[in-house]
């Protein structure tokens, strides 16, 4: 086990929870720790690139994709979502207080060398293709996560 290694499972696509995951991850990486973020189920929506279009999806995959937020700009809040007004208010307050927005946090995470892994099984179940993910994301299964987690001093589930 290495105290300088951290893993975070990102299961949620709630904006506030995702922000917490990236704040912890970038903070640890800035302190010199090795960080792996494993995105599974709803957390995969964080990695979807709103600008990318993918061909060849089945009808059900298209419907599933249409019902999920595509990218970090569309994420709901876990509390006080208010039909989508909550995230807008949160972003307004963040900007006013000079808090880094999620797209910038993701970019910073990549610059800090944080490994971002998308769960292959969840991608398959939810009809998410590698081509629609942001650049720099690795694909891996539960064995990938467990291999990283078995060496880490801290493992979080968000």
Please give the residue ranges for each predicted region:
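Short, glycine-rich nucleotide/cofactor-binding loops
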Residues: 8-18, 47-48, 92-97
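A charged, amphipathic interaction segment
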Residues: 82-140, 144-146
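Secretory/periplasmic and organellar redox-cofactor proteins
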Residues: 1-6, 45
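Polar low-complexity intrinsically disordered regions
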Residues: 5-7, 64, 152-153
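N-terminal beta-loop-helix "entrance" segment that forms/cooperates
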Residues: 44-57
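Short internal beta-strands
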Residues: 35-41, 117-120
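Histidine-anchored nucleotide/phosphate-binding helix
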Residues: 19-32, 37
């Amino acid at each position: 086990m290495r105290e300088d290694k951290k893993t975070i499972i990102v299961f949620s696509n709630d904006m506030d929870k995702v922000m917490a995951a990236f704040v912890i991850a970038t903070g640890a990486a800035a302190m010199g720790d090795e960080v792996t973020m494993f995105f599974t189920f709803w957390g995969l929506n964080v990695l979807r690139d709103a600008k990318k279009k993918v061909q060849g999806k089945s009808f059900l995959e298209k419907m599933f994709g249409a019902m999920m937020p595509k990218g970090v700009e569309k994420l709901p809040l876990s509390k006080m979502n208010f039909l989508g007004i909550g995230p807008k208010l949160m972003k307004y307050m963040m900007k006013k207080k000079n808090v880094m927005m999620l797209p910038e946090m993701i970019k910073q995470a990549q610059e800090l060398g944080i490994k971002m892994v998308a769960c292959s099984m969840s991608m398959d179940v939810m009809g998410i293709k590698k081509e629609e993910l942001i650049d720099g994301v690795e694909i891996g299964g539960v064995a990938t996560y467990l291999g990283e987690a078995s060496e880490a001093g801290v493992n979080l589930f968000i």
